[in-house]
């Protein structure tokens, strides 16, 4: 098994529909340690955060975050993590496109050794 630490940055680029912000790769479990959202809009925005379970093809609402204009919020508080299995997704939705930026820090645990690291 290989452990890969990653930072993932993504813009919530659609309004009123779910956007896949991160998907755990094939044969990989992902442990999301931190998620920071920043609102670049002139007004406050609400962001709905969901976890998609690939095994059951079901979205589970995780949190609705209210973010003031030009401010950020941490989605995960002390000792909270999100564990995603292969194919699971972190999804977000906001009424306004291109105003929410996400940075997530995570650990990917591969079930097999990557060929570029052998």
Feature names for model-found ranges:
Residues 43, 57, 98:
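Surface-exposed, flexible loop/turn segments at secondary-structure boundaries
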Residues 1-30, 34, 93-118:
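C-terminal interaction-tip segments
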Residues 50, 90-91:
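Short conserved beta-strand and strand-loop elements enriched in small hydrophobics
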Residues 48-52, 103-105:
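Beta-strand signatures of extracellular beta-sandwich domains
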Residues 54-89:
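Intrinsically disordered, low-complexity Pro/Gly/Ser/Thr-rich segments with frequent PxxP/GP/PP motifs
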Residues 52-56, 109-111:
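Short edge-strand/loop segments of extracellular domains
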Residues 31-33, 43-45, 86-88:
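A generic structural signal for short beta-strands and their flanking turns/coil linkers
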Residues 37-42, 95:
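Short solvent-exposed strand-capping/beta-turn motif centered on an Asx-Ser/Thr pair
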């Amino acid at each position: 098994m290989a452990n890969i630490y990653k930072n993932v940055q993504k813009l919530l680029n659609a309004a009123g529909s779910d956007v896949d912000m991160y998907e755990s790769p094939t044969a990989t479990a992902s442990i999301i340690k931190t998620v920071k959202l920043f609102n670049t809009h002139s007004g406050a925005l609400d962001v709905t955060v969901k976890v998609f379970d690939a095994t059951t093809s079901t979205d589970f609402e995780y949190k609705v975050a209210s973010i003031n204009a030009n401010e950020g919020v941490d989605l995960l508080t002390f000792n909270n993590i999100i564990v995603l299995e292969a194919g699971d997704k972190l999804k977000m939705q906001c009424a306004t496109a291109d105003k929410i930026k996400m940075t997530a820090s995570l650990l990917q645990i591969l079930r097999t050794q990557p060929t570029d690291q052998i």
